[in-house]
Regions:
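Histidine-/acidic-rich catalytic cores in large beta-rich domains
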Residues: 1-210
């Protein structure tokens, strides 16, 4: 077998729990992105240099970050819609590039995490992309609602990577978006329509009182 196709060193689950699903793993080492069943056996793999974030779309295809870099260390051109045998049906290219996460909306449009590279910051914005045309329909810039560096913070926070958004989640009931901000040690929730900041969860240490 190809030495880039890695077997898990440890896996604990059952066929009753996992059923016909697989666990997809996208490594940051020189290894293939792969899917494993309950026994740890490889059921699927991809030879492209993919890092983020594989999700099964409602049509059965896969959504994942592309393998084409626009800025180091891992910001790529956008998101692929790919079939299980590797055929790329669409590439959604984002002007600021893609990182970490995407979310398929009920109507098929896609939330994609991005940034505005010319201003010198990363991982602090999100866009809504039309599934059929690739056009950007809405944008949420976290600099509109949050104080920028130095606020709160982890040890790896700096002015360039002040927020470090790792994930996005849409809640239909409240019509809102939830984002994680690793470098400010917070989770925030924003109104989908207006972008208004609804709430912040996190340690208030290091934050201005207002």
């Amino acid at each position: 077998a190809d030495d880039k196709l890695k077997a898990p060193t440890y896996m604990e689950t059952t066929s009753e729990y996992l059923e016909d699903f697989v666990i997809m793993v996208s490594p940051t080492s020189p290894a293939y992105t792969a899917a494993y069943d309950y026994a740890g056996d490889v059921r699927w793999y991809n030879t492209l240099n993919l890092a983020f974030d594989i999700k099964r779309a409602r049509n059965g295809r896969l959504l994942m970050g592309t393998d084409r870099l626009v800025a180091p260390p891992y910001h790529t051109t956008g998101v692929y819609e790919m079939g299980m045998i590797g055929k790329v049906y669409r590439e959604y290219r984002i002007p600021g590039g893609y990182h970490h996460d995407e979310w398929e909306m009920e109507n098929g449009d896609i939330l994609i995490l991005t940034q505005y590279l010319p201003r010198g910051t990363v991982e602090d914005a999100c866009v809504l992309v039309d599934r059929k045309t690739g056009k950007i329909l809405k944008e949420w810039d976290h600099q509109d609602v949050l104080p920028v560096y130095p606020v709160g913070g982890s040890g790896s926070q700096d002015a360039h990577d002040w927020f470090h958004n790792n994930a996005v989640w849409y809640d239909k009931k409240t019509n809102s978006l939830t984002f994680s901000g690793r470098h400010q040690d917070i989770i925030i929730n924003r109104d989908f329509e207006t972008g208004k900041l609804n709430w912040i969860i996190g340690d208030p240490t290091g934050w201005p009182e207002d």
